Amino acid sequence: MKNVTHSFVFLAHWPFAGSFGLNTDILATNLINLTVVVGVLIFFGKGVLKDLLDNRKQRILSTIRNSEELRRGTLEQLEKARIRLQKVELEADEYRMNGYSEIEREKENLINATSISLEQLEKSKNETLYFEKQRAMNQVRQRVFQQAVQGALGTLNSCLNTELHFRTIRANIGILGAIEWKR
């Protein structure tokens, strides 16, 4: 109770203000000054605060709308890219399969062409060997024949004398005469 009494005594000693003013010292302000300041702030600040909040709200909403549009556009681009990727993968698979089959076809063609070339080369080699063999045999025959003829001529020349020569001529003339007489 003593505290309450001191409060009233203390209020009685306050001097009266000569003019109206705002006390800027927060610890020394009274309830009326605080109410006036808060009321003025609410009255004048309400419109400004509302405008600021509305502007902020509009910016946030437009940012959200832009983000949604960008998201939709990005999703569309992503879907187009996925479709394009699938198409490219299908084409790549097709090219790969065609490439493999083309490689196999070319490999078979190359093997066939090489086989044919080898067969032709083998045939040509065999023909060449046959002709060379025939030529060599003909040369050997010719050489043997020449040597035989030379040997026979040598033998005849060494064995023939004039008397044998005349007898041979007479025998041949006799044979020719017999042939003529029969006609």
From Swiss-Prot:
Q: How does it sit in the membrane?
A: Single-pass membrane protein
Q: Name one GO molecular function term.
A: proton-transporting ATP synthase activity, rotational mechanism
Q: Which InterPro entries match?
A: ATP_synth_b/b'su_bac/chlpt
Its principal location?
Answer: plastid
- Keywords for this entry? ATP synthesis, ATP-binding, CF(0), Chloroplast, Hydrogen ion transport, Ion transport, Membrane, Nucleotide-binding, Plastid, Thylakoid, Transmembrane, Transmembrane helix, Transport
Keyword match Magnesium: no
Q: Which domain of life is it from?
A: Eukaryota
Q: What other comment is given for this protein?
A: In plastids the F-type ATPase is also known as CF(1)CF(0).
Question: What's this protein's family per the entry?
Answer: Belongs to the ATPase B chain family.
Quaternary structure? F-type ATPases have 2 components, F(1) - the catalytic core - and F(0) - the membrane proton channel. F(1) has five subunits: alpha(3), beta(3), gamma(1), delta(1), epsilon(1). F(0) has four main subunits: a(1), b(1), b'(1) and c(10-14). The alpha and beta chains form an alternating ring which encloses part of the gamma chain. F(1) is attached to F(0) by a central stalk formed by the gamma and epsilon chains, while a peripheral stalk is formed by the delta, b and b' chains.
What protein name is recorded for this chain? ATP synthase subunit b, chloroplastic
